[in-house]
């Protein structure tokens, strides 16, 4: 094998290695985030559901990244089951006068959603920057 053939093989092997290395995904610190808003949400309003893989140990939370137009909002985390009634995992209140977050801790692998259970100061609430992390 000539020198140019050896160099060609080394270059080809190096390029193939770089393609493989570039295709490897680095795991994220947060498994999932829902960035959304609430417009005139009333008591009983349900967020969309999400699947928590429980692969990262992150505490499930709701956050107001903007102030809202009521005094406070109470959110309840719901653990969804297909074969029995859903489980209520607790209610957390968030003030509307400032940004903030409330946490339910790490949850097991399954489907979840959040429900508005109370609104203080108004009949409905709007939050321009509402987030769920899981």
PLM regions with names:
Residues 29-134:
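Post-signal peptide N-terminal regions of Sec-secreted extracellular proteins
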Residues 1-50:
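N-terminal prepro-regions of secreted/extracellular proteins
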